[in-house]
């Protein structure tokens, strides 16, 4: 005997003799639904068309999708399924497909790069009568060029297209290159974050029992696990919510002032509104961010990967007070030197840089404020 609790189209069985499990599930259901919708909004996806499953990483999500598609084809026909993969896919895709091929569960075709991207025509030419899935990432793992996911999906004519789109999201290009049928993401909500597998509901048909173990009404994410995932998401630091909060504070401040100035002015130079009366000539624009990594790691990565000129890293309560950032955000601060006029595009660029670095920096914790480093 079991009662069914729905969560965004996914179901879980709850034994009636475990009321504490039901309470935990109800506590986590609404907040987790909010995170699901937040992710779909980030992707530009219609919430009514997609299922979302939280995973440990994009690697797990990719493996779920590939193995389920192969097994579904084997259940439908005796013909060995065929999988199309790109030449620059992440190892979680290529190794999974090759392992299934060694077990004689599938065959596969690797699409070579043309001008550092996957040509939709080459994908069309590779289609066979037994093709069950194509795996083409939003960006190539080696050279980071964009693939035309919608064009590739059009030539597949109903064959599901699965895409790893983490780089597209963290580079701010997902709206220009939206996923087609299913997608995976890595390290959402901070460097201790979660992975995501998103699928259109029409692609989900018959895949549910294979991905969730016992079908949509059994073996899917259990109720205590829903609440645990919710607690995990809200405890991540830094989180998307936190970064967006700081971003909004800067937008509000920069509507009144062209620059956020480096500290070093005497108190006589600072009027009641916390900013200098006269703008010093030639003073470049700066943006301040609270980040979850040590200053030394960020300095090298930003300078080498993005060619952004770094000013200096400080920890100054006076500066935070001037621009009215709440005390709970007083952590290691990063000043990134930009152009003479700090525009919204500059802010957007820095947002993308820091969110991307969030996904590639090893796990760690913030140093105490007194240990913040500075450099010229």
From Swiss-Prot:
Residues at which pyridoxal 5'-phosphate binds: 58-59, 184-186
Keywords, alphabetical: Virion
A GO cellular component annotation in the UniProt record: virion component
SUPFAM superfamilies linked: PLP-dependent transferases
Subcellular location: Virion
PANTHER family in UniProt: CYSTEINE DESULFURASE (PTHR11601:SF34), CYSTEINE DESULFURYLASE FAMILY MEMBER (PTHR11601)
Protein name per the record: NifS-like protein
Organism whose genome encodes this protein: African swine fever virus (isolate Tick/Malawi/Lil 20-1/1983)
